[in-house]
Amino acid sequence: FDVMGIIKKIAGAL
């Protein structure tokens, strides 16, 4: 589970 990856994905989707 890549936490930073998820955060970056959410940040990129915003």
UniProtKB/Swiss-Prot annotation:
The keyword Transcription regulation does not apply. GO terms for molecular function: toxin activity. It is found in: Secreted; Target cell membrane. Expressed by the venom gland. Transmembrane segments: none annotated. The modification Leucine amide is found at residue 14. GO terms for biological process: defense response to bacterium; defense response to fungus; innate immune response; killing of cells of another organism. Keywords: Amidation, Antibiotic, Antimicrobial, Cytolysis, Fungicide, G-protein coupled receptor impairing toxin, Immunity, Innate immunity, Mast cell degranulation, Membrane, Secreted, Target cell membrane, Target membrane, Toxin. One of its GO terms (cellular component) is extracellular region. The keyword Secreted applies. Linear cationic alpha-helical peptide with antimicrobial activities against both Gram-positive and Gram-negative strains and against the yeast C.albicans. Shows moderate mast cell degranulation and leishmanicidal activities. Has a very low hemolytic activity. Its mast cell degranulation activity may be related to the activation of G-protein coupled receptors in mast cells as well as interaction with other proteins located in cell endosomal membranes in the mast cells. Belongs to the MCD family. Mastoparan subfamily. This is Eumenine mastoparan-EF. It comes from Eumenes fraterculus (Solitary wasp).
